[in-house]
């Protein structure tokens, strides 16, 4: 795609042969504007979780790119996602984060919509509209496609886009590491608490790229490792288990998804963790044993940071989260982080994990604040005229990816780079 050269945008932004990527992609306002039309208006985006709307009339205000949307359950129990904008003059019809209602009423002129999107009330319908307004033409704008997968809700404005599971492809197994139970049972995850939200001064692609498989920034979190802020009380991560695994970068190029994952050997036995809390340690010991008894490739995988194109980050390990990088402008991103836990986990386990998630994540979290500082200063340092002349380098692993990677009988999809020696 090309743009007016006077607007500061040049062709040749990505050189696949040399691994050079122009900084313009991360700081250019015109590119950002095109992304809203060509990426966010056509992609599958994460909306929320069905546990946020368990009852008829429940709603949750979410986002799709720059658009405000409403996730709600109608009186018949069906799930909908609507554009949060009145068809009359465009005012938001819902200004609360969540709740329960029978109708969404626009505070501007009073048009009212049912939880199924139908226009059910128009002030002065007889007196001013002479009963001639066709209310069926002015339903709330609804997404073209909707998919509920293991409790998560995804939506797409593009009716011609492939179905969600086709969009996921073989990357589905990595999302399952979050949504399935720690013991391997399908779809056992539930949201823990509310949604953590904050704004960071950088382009949305900085965090998205970071979670797409950047394995080279552990130095940023060195201080956290020294503190021993991990769930076991010994380090930020349980390195003992990771040290016996194969560390892999997995990319599904035709869909844009990427992740880091760890592949355990066949004969691996669960290692002790959460030693400072015997009840929590016993729960996860039992779950690990059950998981390895169940058939399926995921019993040998340890999840790590990943990204579902375009803007949903995975973190299947503790903290077990999905994060959404909502674009606000070319230079600002709103982060929404959703935390997960097994729905039938004992209350002490949920409380323990809640405390750890808060300690780890968000603008006050001991780890994530390091990431935010990196993204903030990388963005601001890339906006100048001189800085834009010098591309970023993405040469790590170039020429060393393999298709159909296999180790001890377990195959990985997509293009895989073995990073075991780089741990």
Language-model features, listed with the residues they occupy:
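Short Pro/Gly-enriched beta-strand edge/turn motifs at strand-loop
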Residues: 42-54, 124-130, 303-309
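Non-catalytic accessory segments flanking enzyme active sites
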Residues: 19-70
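C-terminal catalytic domain of Rieske-type non-heme iron oxygenases
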Residues: 144-423
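Generic structural signal for secondary-structure transition and capping sites
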Residues: 40-44, 91, 216
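Short, contiguous pre-domain boundary segments
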Residues: 8-23
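Rieske [2Fe-2S] iron-sulfur-binding domain
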Residues: 52-159, 163-173
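Short clusters of hydrophobic/aromatic residues that line enzyme substrate/ligand-binding pockets
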Residues: 47, 93, 119, 313, ...
């Amino acid at each position: 795609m090309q743009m007016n050269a006077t607007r500061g945008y040049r062709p040749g932004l990505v050189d696949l042969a040399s691994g050079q990527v122009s900084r313009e992609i991360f700081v250019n306002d015109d590119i950002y504007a095109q992304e809203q039309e060509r990426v966010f208006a056509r992609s599958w985006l994460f909306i929320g979780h069905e546990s946020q709307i368990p009852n008829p009339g429940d709603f949750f205000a979410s986002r799709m790119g720059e658009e405000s949307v409403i996730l709600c359950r109608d009186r018949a129990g069906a799930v909908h996602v609507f554009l949060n904008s009145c068809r009359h003059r465009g005012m938001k019809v819902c200004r609360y984060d969540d709740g329960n209602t029978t109708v969404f009423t626009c505070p501007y002129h009073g048009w009212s919509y049912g939880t199924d999107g139908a226009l059910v009330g128009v002030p002065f319908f007889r007196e001013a509209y002479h009963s001639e307004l066709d209310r069926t033409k002015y339903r709330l704008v609804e997404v073209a496609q909707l998919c509920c997968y293991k409790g998560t809700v995804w939506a797409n404005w593009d009716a011609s886009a492939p179905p969600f599971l086709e969009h996921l492809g073989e990357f589905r197994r990595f999302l399952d590491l979050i949504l399935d139970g720690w013991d391997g049972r399908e779809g056992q995850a539930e949201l823990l608490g509310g949604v953590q939200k904050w704004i960071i001064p950088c382009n949305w692609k900085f965090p998205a790229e970071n979670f797409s498989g950047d394995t080279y920034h552990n130095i940023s979190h060195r201080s956290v490792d020294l503190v021993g802020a991990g769930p076991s009380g010994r380090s930020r991560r349980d390195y003992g288990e990771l040290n016996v695994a194969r560390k892999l970068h997995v990319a599904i190029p035709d869909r844009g998804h990427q992740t880091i994952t760890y592949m355990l050997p066949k004969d691996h036995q669960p290692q002790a963790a959460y030693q400072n809390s015997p009840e929590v340690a016993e729960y996860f010991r039992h779950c690990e044993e059950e998981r390895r008894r169940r058939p399926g490739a995921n019993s040998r995988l340890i999840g790590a940071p990943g990204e579902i194109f375009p803007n949903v980050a995975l973190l299947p390990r503790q903290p077990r989260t999905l994060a959404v990088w909502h674009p606000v402008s070319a230079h600002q991103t709103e982060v929404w982080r959703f935390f997960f836990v097994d729905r039938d986990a004992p209350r002490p386990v949920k409380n323990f994990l809640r405390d750890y998630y808060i300690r780890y994540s968000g603008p006050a979290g001991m780890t994530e604040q390091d990431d935010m500082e990196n993204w903030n200063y990388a963005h601001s340092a890339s906006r100048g005229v001189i800085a834009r002349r010098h591309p970023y380098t993405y040469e790590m692993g170039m020429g060393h990816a393999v298709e159909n990677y296999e180790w001890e009988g377990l195959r990985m999809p997509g293009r895989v780079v073995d990073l075991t020696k780089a741990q």
